[in-house]
Design a protein with these regions (language model features):
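Positively charged n-region of N-terminal signal peptides that target proteins for export
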Residues: 1-7
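Bacterial N-terminal signal peptides
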Residues: 7-17
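N-terminal leader/targeting segments and the immediate start of mature chains
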Residues: 18-48, 52-54, 233-235
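Extended lipid/amphipathic-ligand handling interfaces
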Residues: 32, 63-68, 158-166
Length: 235
């Protein structure tokens, strides 16, 4: 028994520095992600959403997305538009290490590049709090996969492809695999006849992004729901 306890002590002692290093690497990965996009002030992009979802038949949907980090977003569409909140939009600033307990899971190779898998758990648990598992390309500091899960069993997996626009790598395609409550997880913009989405969905959603305009000086007015006439401000 003494030999077993002694062995256990030495294994723990030897592994502790490795675990500590892994946790530090996890925090650095999030820091690098924030730093990479620190100069991103705003972007505008055309969005196309294609649904392959059980029990939900809809044509492809188009909209224009306005985003001003860290947390301002507006969707403009001439018709009804559904966009999944979990993984449907790109916001690298949502993963602030001060807001999460960050746990290192593993190192891996993703598309031939070095990557790490991290688990992020919110420090403040709210009713709609979600856990995240991120696969981060550590060579280019990009989130390649994002899995979200919530207390009520909703799960979304997002795979992200990027292109280079201005000085930034921004998504060109996000593929979502859903097992969620549709009405709770979708941004809905109704500019045509009224319609109701189904209550629950399982399936795949392909979101493609094109015609980026980056750091164009979007006015704060555009995010005012009562006044969207002035789309841009500044030079």
């Amino acid at each position: 028994m003494k030999k077993f306890l002694l062995c256990l002590f030495w294994v723990t002692f030897l592994l502790s520095p490795c675990l500590l290093q892994a946790q530090e690497d996890a925090a650095r990965s999030l820091d690098a992600l924030q730093k990479k996009y620190s100069g991103l002030k705003d972007y505008t992009v055309d969005v196309n959403v294609h649904f392959d979802v059980e029990g939900f038949k809809a044509p492809d949907m188009q909209a224009k997305l306005y985003c001003k980090p860290p947390d301002r977003m507006k969707i403009e569409s001439k018709r009804i538009f559904f966009l999944p909140k979990e993984g449907g939009t790109f916001n690298p600033f949502m993963f602030n290490k001060e807001d999460f307990e960050v746990r290192f899971l593993e190192r891996l190779t993703y598309d031939g590049r070095n990557a790490v898998k991290l688990k992020l758990t919110p420090k403040k648990r709210k009713l709609n709090a979600q856990d995240f598992i991120l696969t981060v390309d550590t060579d280019r500091h990009l989130i390649r996969e994002m899995n979200t899960s919530s207390f009520d069993g909703r799960e979304v997996k997002a795979s992200i492809e990027y292109g280079h626009f201005g000085d930034f790598d921004l998504p060109t395609r996000i593929e979502l695999h859903l097992d969620v409550q549709f009405s709770e997880s979708m941004e809905i913009r109704d500019f045509g006849p009224s319609a109701q989405p189904p209550k629950g969905v399982t399936g795949r959603v392909d979101i493609t992004y094109s015609n980026y305009s980056v750091n164009s000086g979007l006015s704060d007015q555009i995010f005012n729901k009562t006044d969207s006439s002035n789309l841009r401000g500044g030079s």
